[in-house]
């Protein structure tokens, strides 16, 4: 069996409480999960059970105060900004609500080029990649010049997926 690509071991996420001597709020208490290459996993649970918090911990957006978050064998729980930026080539997120995750004032091309620009991809290569991404998610190439509001919810979800795939994670 192959080693996990993502391995969360006893992850704890705590947030400080306001007030003198109040114990921190434990948003996650010892959560473990491993995902192997090529595996698809869905997290299911009650509202407030920590699904989003675990995702945020993996992405470095929630403070991991215990346990480990290993990506390809490296503990990424306490990576700084430069390390996170380099890691963004390998880890991307597709948000649950695609409309609020897409900037309404940018064209689809601008939205898809943004992660490529951050990684210093040449403009000509980025434009070519946009066409590939649209094709990959089943949208016509003329979608690049349109705004998010011009698409259905399902099409916006495909645009969000295309953005996540832009860097070939």
Cite the ranges covered by each PLM segment.
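Helix-to-loop junction immediately C-terminal to a conserved catalytic motif
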Residues: 59
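The feature captures the beta-strand-to-loop junction immediately N-terminal to the Walker
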Residues: 44-46
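Hydrophobic anchor residue at the start of the ABC signature
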Residues: 161
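Conserved ABC ATPase signature
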Residues: 147-151, 155
């Amino acid at each position: 069996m192959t080693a996990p690509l993502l391995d969360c071991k006893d992850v704890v996420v705590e947030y400080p409480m306001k007030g003198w001597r109040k114990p921190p709020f434990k948003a996650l208490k010892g959560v473990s999960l491993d995902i192997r290459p090529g595996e698809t996993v869905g997290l299911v649970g009650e509202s407030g059970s920590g699904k989003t918090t675990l995702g945020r911990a993996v992405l470095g957006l929630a403070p991991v105060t215990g346990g480990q978050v290993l990506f390809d064998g490296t503990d990424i729980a306490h990576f700084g900004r430069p390390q996170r930026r380099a890691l963004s080539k390998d880890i991307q997120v597709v948000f649950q609500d695609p409309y609020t995750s897409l900037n309404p004032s940018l064209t689809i091309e601008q939205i898809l080029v943004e992660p490529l620009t951050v990684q210093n991809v040449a403009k000509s290569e980025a434009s070519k990649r946009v066409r590939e991404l649209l094709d990959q998610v089943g949208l016509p190439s003329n979608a690049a010049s349109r705004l998010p509001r011009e698409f259905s919810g399902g099409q916006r979800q495909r645009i969000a997926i295309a953005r996540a795939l832009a860097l070939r994670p």
